[in-house]
């Protein structure tokens, strides 16, 4: 059965096209126009320091760890099938998916089976990395930005992964405006938790704008009431002067 599942994944034209796109265009993080974008977290210790991993015979943390992880993930795809490098990359991909202190997963454990098989909700907890506590501190956000070569009043960390519980009053703006959590809240499964359908970040030459979306009411109701997806837009940061092409990374 495992062989059949493997063959189905390997022979799926659409899936393989998508994977090729991710590897050719994607990366574990991106620095762009003064912003640091990544999905999960920069792993930290409980006392607020960058978590150190010993990999390839060397201690690595922060940006150096991210660069190593990005290279290892590519080994899993580009190296020759059956080679030690490919197997090492595949093992590292498994860690990135659900491993403790993974920069993509950002939790200590995954409790998918517990949620399905155990009624006691205390068994479902997935403790988050300390990063999700410290990212409320503007000084920590500034230190993380410096780690990736960014410094200035309009530099930001743009984060995903963790749904923002808007219905409980949680804001996507963290760290005194230095960090933004833009999670894919359009996913219907999360809307009971968040209370909305996620956020869109709009960035132009004049400002940063956050747009929050209300859940889609359904096709029949939308036609009956002539109602599309309702959105609320808020400008949360303005630039002192318009950003010109010369001030961007790639124009």
Model-identified regions with their sequence ranges:
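Feature recognizes metal-dependent phosphohydrolase scaffolds
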Residues: 1-251
